[in-house]
Amino acid sequence: MNKEIQQAKHSKNINKPFTDKDSIRVSVLSEALPYIQRFANKRIVIKYGGSAMADKTLQNAVFRDLALLSSVGVQIVVVHGGGPEINQWLEKLGIKPVFLDGLRITDTETMDVVEMVLTGRVNKQIVSGINNHGRLAVGLCGIDGGLIEARTLGGGSHGLVGEVAKVNTKILSPLLEEGYVPVISSVANSSDGKSHNINADTVAGELAAALGAEKLILLTDTPGILRNENDPSSLIEKIRLSEARELIDKGIVKAGMKPKVECCIRSLAQGVNAAHIIDGRTPHSLLLEVFTDAGIGTMVMGRG
């Protein structure tokens, strides 16, 4: 009798009606399939920053997204910042953060803290988060393997703030081919051996170009490029390279968005297929961008 009851229950479960939620799940998987096939063994560089780094729930969503992208064969490179945590540690150590034109003034003492926080703490937290979701991440900075050579920005008025002088991706290619996820902090040495702090957006863009990446994705605290910075509904979903330059020239793109768009422009000019500025405050925004028809945020197109 018990066996008959179990069989009846099993039969009932098999014949259970398909719900709307079930249909949505199937639809999502079906929509994702061509993108999974398209981006298998392709390289995507992701700049991880903003609220997605500060909020624990968003952090976990990003780590899951990165693990999923890697598990279906996408070759992922993660570049990260960590400004808020740097400020917290400077405060703990009694060092007052100083900024000029939006950039941190980085003397030797401050640079020691920047390197400690970015490379020793934030980087390892990200590596651990990805590893906890079943993938193998490797923590690096620009110094490792001569990955990035820095050049002091401008006339040195910002101290040890640098820009990218050279990129050598030799250390990255074998890691990517073996399925590892390189996680890179934006600290690099200049030719004279001095550590420099480089804007993480800039590092991500230059790495994307050097790696011949399919996409550059910047996680931000904004929906994307807005025609009116105070109106989220003015989001520009797609824009060509020439149009992006015009928005900067006209002053529509300004302040914190300007260096991000400039980063996209430089990477596209060097052969990256597409650059995306997306809202990292939206859970699973990476998957929405890569694996759905509609995408999310702003796509800056380099071709056509």
Swiss-Prot record:
Q: EC annotation?
A: 2.7.2.8
Which Pfam families does this one have? AA_kinase
Q: Name one GO biological process term.
A: arginine biosynthetic process via ornithine
Q: Where is this site: Transition state stabilizer?
A: K47, K260
Which keywords are on file for this protein? Answer: Amino-acid biosynthesis, Arginine biosynthesis, ATP-binding, Cytoplasm, Kinase, Nucleotide-binding, Transferase
Q: Where in the cell is it found?
A: Cytoplasm
Q: Which InterPro entries does UniProt cross-reference here?
A: AceGlu_kinase-like_sf, AcgluKinase_fam, ArgB, Asp/Glu/Uridylate_kinase, Glu/AcGlu_kinase, NAGK-C
Pathway, per UniProt? Answer: Amino-acid biosynthesis; L-arginine biosynthesis; N(2)-acetyl-L-ornithine from L-glutamate: step 2/4
Gene Ontology cellular-component annotations: cytoplasm
According to the UniProt entry, its GO molecular function terms are:
acetylglutamate kinase activity; ATP binding
Q: Please list the reactions this protein catalyses.
A: N-acetyl-L-glutamate + ATP = N-acetyl-L-glutamyl 5-phosphate + ADP
Is Ribosomal protein included in the keywords of this UniProt record?
Answer: no
Give binding positions for substrate.
Answer: G82, G83, R104, N197
Alphabetical list of PANTHER family matching this protein: N-ACETYLGLUTAMATE SYNTHASE, N-ACETYLGLUTAMATE SYNTHASE, MITOCHONDRIAL
Concerning NCBIfam families, the annotation shows: argB
Q: Give the UniProt family note.
A: Belongs to the acetylglutamate kinase family. ArgB subfamily.
Please give the function described in this protein's UniProt entry: Catalyzes the ATP-dependent phosphorylation of N-acetyl-L-glutamate.
Report what the protein is called. Acetylglutamate kinase
Gene name on record?
argB
